[in-house]
C-alpha cells in the first residue's frame, strides 16, 4: 500500500478493507505486529487507502466496532480521539482524502504526548502524508476532538438561514439556497 495516489487506475481490495478490521476485532488481535492497532487503526497508509476507496462511514464503523469490543479505557480513548477527528474533518475528507494527514495532525497534535498510538500515527502522517499533501501543520491548529464541537455541517455554498432537528434526534435539515438533510445518528 505504499505511494498510493488518487488516480483512476488505482484498484483497492475492498474485501480486505471490510474483513480485516472485523476479523481482527472478533479474534481479539488488538496488539502486536499483526494486530488491529498497528495495521489498521493507527496506520496512516491503511487509513488513507480506505478513505480513498470507501466512504468515511465505513472507516468510522471500524473505530466504533473496535470500541465496542475493547475493555482497556486508554486504548478506547485513543481510538475515540482518532474517530472523532475523522468525524470533525468529515466534510473535507469525504471529498479530499489527501487531507487526511493535515486533518489528523491539526486536530491531534496536542494529544500525542500522552497517547503512544496517536504519536505513532502522527509520525506516519508527518513522514508519509507528504506524498499526498505538502501542507502539513507544525502546530495544533484545529478543533480538538472531545470538546463541545461534535460535528461540522459543511455543504452549503451560502449562509444557512434555518435548520431543524427531527423529533427522533436522528436528522438535521438545513436550509440555504437548497435543503440538506444530515444524518447525525451515524
Q: What are the functions of these language-model segments?
A:
Residues 175-177:
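Conserved strand-to-loop turn within each blade of WD40 beta-propeller repeats
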Residues 1-148:
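Hydrophobic repeat-domain scaffold segments
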Residues 153-160:
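WD40/WD-repeat beta-propeller blade N-cap
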Residues 167-168:
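Residue-level detector of Asp-centered blade-edge/turn motifs that repeat once per structural unit
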Residues 113, 159, 180-181:
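Eukaryotic short linear interaction motifs
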Residues 163, 179-185:
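WD40-repeat beta-propellers
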Amino acid at each position: 500500500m505504499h505511494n498510493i495516489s488518487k488516480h483512476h487506475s488505482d484498484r483497492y481490495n475492498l474485501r480486505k478493507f471490510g474483513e480485516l478490521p472485523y476479523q481482527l476485532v472478533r479474534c481479539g488481535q488488538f496488539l502486536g505486529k499483526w494486530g488491529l492497532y498497528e495495521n489498521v487503526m493507527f496506520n496512516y497508509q491503511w487509513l488513507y487507502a480506505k478513505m480513498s476507496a470507501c466512504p468515511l462511514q465505513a472507516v468510522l464503523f471500524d473505530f466504533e466496532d473496535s470500541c465496542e469490543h475493547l475493555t482497556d479505557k486508554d486504548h478506547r480513548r485513543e481510538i475515540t480521539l482518532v474517530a472523532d477527528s475523522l468525524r470533525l474533518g468529515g466534510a473535507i475528507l469525504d471529498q479530499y482524502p489527501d487531507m487526511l494527514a493535515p486533518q489528523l495532525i491539526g486536530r491531534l497534535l496536542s494529544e500525542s504526548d500522552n497517547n503512544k498510538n496517536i504519536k505513532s500515527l502522527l509520525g506516519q502522517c508527518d513522514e508519509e502524508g507528504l506524498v499526498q499533501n505538502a501542507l502539513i501543520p507544525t502546530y495544533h491548529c484545529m478543533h480538538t476532538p472531545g470538546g463541545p464541537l461534535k460535528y461540522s455541517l459543511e455543504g452549503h455554498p451560502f449562509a444557512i438561514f434555518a435548520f431543524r432537528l427531527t423529533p427522533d434526534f436522528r436528522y438535521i435539515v438545513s436550509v440555504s439556497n437548497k435543503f440538506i438533510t444530515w444524518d447525525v445518528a451515524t
